[in-house]
Design a protein with these regions (language model features):
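Glycine/charged-rich beta-loop-alpha catalytic/anionic-binding loops adjacent to active sites
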Residues: 6-11, 38-54
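Mixed-charge interfacial surface used for oligomerization/domain docking
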Residues: 27-30, 52, 58-68, 72-219, ...
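Active-site-proximal beta-strand/loop segments in catalytic clefts of secreted hydrolases
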Residues: 14, 56-57
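Short Gly/Thr/Asp-enriched flexible loops that form oxyanion-binding sites at enzyme active sites
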Residues: 12-43, 67
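A short, small-residue-rich loop immediately preceding and capping a beta-strand
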Residues: 9-13, 87-90
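Glycine-rich, often proline-containing surface loops adjacent to acidic residues and nearby aromatics
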Residues: 5-9, 65-68
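Glycine-rich oxoanion-binding loops at beta->alpha junctions
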Residues: 1-2
């Protein structure tokens, strides 16, 4: 429920290609601006109420870093239209690294996005040989960076890659990690501790949280996802 004093709402929606959430939010925004604007005027508030909806375009729901940067800019006193403009430019710089825990990840993901299965057969064979893929997602693109022997090795490589990006410099000072399991086990990993140290040294905020149910169902129990801002497109 919105307070009458609320001047604006800024929503970063799930990627439009992933479903109807973005279009539904646009429709809801129009209705909300009319209804809430009317309610404010009845209480003598002349300032117009506005709502913005941004298509995150990120793969696997990598909105976390976008939300963090949005909050930082607003706290710094940046105007909402300028924040929307900056977030729009940053969307394509979100890199998501995923270590799936389930061999059917590619099959489920391709069915969700309506794409041909990505390396589904080779991944299935690799899993039999205890080879775990490190998957990189950016926008609509999904690719296997490498396959490593064992899940723990793939997780370590993901953290090492992001640690290097933090040291090189990020487009925005945030890294979001989500895990489909007990977060305590992640905090104890040497590679995560090294990432924490790098973030502290370079004034980057690191968030660790439980993975959403929807993503956990997609990538499997025990899977890991890391969302940093890369320094440059194509980094």
């Amino acid at each position: 429920r919105l307070l009458a004093s609320t001047d604006f709402v800024l929503e970063i929606a799930q990627a439009s290609r992933r479903g109807n959430a973005y279009m539904n939010s646009l429709t809801a925004a129009q209705n909300l601006m009319l209804q809430h604007g009317r309610a404010r005027r009845q209480q003598g508030i002349a300032r117009p109420f506005k709502m913005w909806v941004i298509d995150s375009t990120t793969a696997l729901n990598g909105q976390g870093v976008l939300v963090c940067e949005c909050a930082r800019l607003l706290d710094d006193g940046i105007s909402v239209p300028r924040v929307v403009q900056q977030i729009d430019g940053l969307r394509q710089q979100v890199r998501t690294l995923v270590v799936p825990a389930d061999v059917s990840f590619f099959q489920r993901r391709s069915r969700l996005d309506g794409e041909a299965p990505l390396a589904w057969l080779s991944y299935g064979v690799g899993k039999v040989l205890d080879r775990t893929p490190l998957v990189r997602a950016q926008g609509a693109e999904l690719s296997v960076v490498t396959q490593l022997r064992g899940f723990d090795a793939a997780v370590a490589r993901a953290f090492e890659s992001v640690t290097q990006q933090v040291r090189t410099g990020l487009a925005a000072p945030f890294v979001c990690v989500s895990f489909a399991g007990d977060e305590t086990s992640v905090r104890q990993l040497p590679a995560f501790i090294a990432l924490e140290d790098a973030c502290l040294r370079h004034q980057v905020t690191l968030h660790l949280a439980s993975m959403s149910m929807g993503n956990a169902l997609l990538v499997g129990r025990g899977a890991l996802r890391v969302d940093p801002f890369a320094l440059h497109v194509g980094h």
